[in-house]
Amino acid sequence: MAKDNSWVFGIESTIFTIVEKRISEKLSDDYPDLYITNSDKNTDDPVFPTIYLHELPGSEQGNDLEGKDINAVMETFQVEVTSARSQQEAKKVLAEVLMVFKEMRFQITAMPEFKSGDETYRSIARCRRLIGASECDTLGNK
C-alpha cells in the first residue's frame, strides 16, 4: 500500500513557519520591523531588514524497488537578508537565520555572499538537508 506523499509539498511552509517563529523570538527586540517572507514579489513599501527564504528545487532520495513512495527529499533553501542600514546588519541577521537552520540539522552549503547596491546591502547563503518522510513532524524540535 502506498504512503501519502503529500508531506513533500508542505516542506517549504513547515520550514518557513519554524524559521519565522524562532527568528521573530530572537530578533524582535532589536528589529521590531523585521519582515520575513517566502514570496519573491511584494507590492508594499519595502521594510528592512527583510529575510527572504526561497526553496530551491529538491531531489528525491532513497527510492525503493516499487518506486511508489517518496521516502526522502534533498532540500535546499536560499536565505537572503536585505538591509537598508549596513552590511553589518545584514550579516548579523543572516547569522541568526543560519543558526536556526543549523538547529534543524541543515548543512550550510554556500557560505554568506555579500552584495551591496545603491541603497541596500544583501547577505546570501544556502542550506541543505536530507529530509525523510517521517521527519516533517519533528523538524521544529531542538
Can you name each region flagged by the protein language model?
Residues 71-85, 121-132:
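Oligomerization/assembly interface segments of phage tail-like spikes and tubes
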Residues 92-142:
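Acidic-leaning, charged glycine-interspersed low-complexity segments
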Residues 1-64:
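Small/polar-rich, solvent-exposed N-terminal microdomains that initiate assembly or binding
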Residues 15, 19, 23, 34-36, ...:
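Hydrophobic beta-strand residues in large extracellular and virion-surface proteins
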Residues 45-47, 68-73, 117-121:
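A generic structural micro-feature
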Residues 1-6, 71, 135-142:
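Compositionally biased, intrinsically disordered low-complexity segments enriched in polar/Pro/Gly
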